Amino acid sequence: AGVICSKVARYHERIHHPDRLTQPLRRTGSKGSGQFSPISWDDALDEVAQRFLEAEQRHGSETVWPYYYAGTMGLVMRDGINRLRHVKRYSGFHSTICVNMGWNGFIAGTGRLAGVDPREMGCSDLIIIWGTNAASTQINVMTHALKARRERGAKIVVIDTYNNATAKQADLFVCVRPGTDGALACALMHVLFRDDKADWDYLREFTDCPDAVETHLRPRDPAWAEAISGVPASQIETLASMIGSTPKTFFRLGYGFTRQRNGAASMHAALSISAVAGSWRHEGGGAFHTN
């Protein structure tokens, strides 16, 4: 027996819903009027192709931008248009808008997108779930995290902007003001450096410019971060102490806190905590975003 992820558990209702669109519609009224008339697939394809050609001729082929989101995640349906896009020299983009900030921030810190195997959470003593409501959307994360709590006594920390289902299962919930996660991350690293909890051997062997990072973070203490993030300085001190005293700290970094103007920098900052603490060197430690 298994569990169906709540993200797809109701897909059958969407597929078989009586109001689901099953044929193309052409708008016959003004935008927002809700006035549409059915047309054939042949007419619809011809009209779309004609619009593409008009855009190419008037403004250049790069003004046509095939875009996908979460409606279809299958490789054939999602990426099938790439052959047309390449031949016609249409604009392209790196995956989707919703993941670009997070992916680039993670790559900036590690050089590649892959992180620690999420199954290592079962070996962790401290699990920090940051910017993702895993209890509602990621069964695998909560399975491993709760196993570590049950079998090892691991602590679970949730950092998010609201008290969601995951936060309700946390040993410590840190409620951060939206868009300010980077400041929180900087203050956590500040405390690790200040209290001699930084793993300098790891930093000097595996990271770039650790001395410059430490200098950069000196003025960014918990009081500074509290004014920006709304997280009490005392809570920042508590969390930093937990990280600094727990070698097997696993960071599960989600997409939520990266979907804002400073998203890439916020991801890079949060990811850097595991390097400052030296968590990467331990089984059950390090960071995971997506594999």
Language-model segments: residues:
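A glycine-rich, hydrophobic/aromatic-adjacent loop/helix-cap motif
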Residues: 243-291
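Short helix-capping/linker segments at secondary-structure and domain boundaries
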Residues: 92, 192-200, 262, 277-284
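Structured helix-beta-strand junction loops
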Residues: 124, 151, 220, 245-246, ...
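Flexible, glycine/charged-enriched surface loops at secondary-structure junctions
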Residues: 59-63, 198-203, 250, 281-288
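An alpha-helix initiation/capping motif
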Residues: 75, 207, 211, 234-237, ...
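N-terminal export/assembly segments and adjacent metallocofactor-ligating motifs
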Residues: 1-197, 209, 232
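Generic recognition of flexible, low-complexity loop/linker segments
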Residues: 52-54, 114-118, 236-241, 276, ...
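P-loop NTPase catalytic nucleotide-binding module
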Residues: 179, 183-249
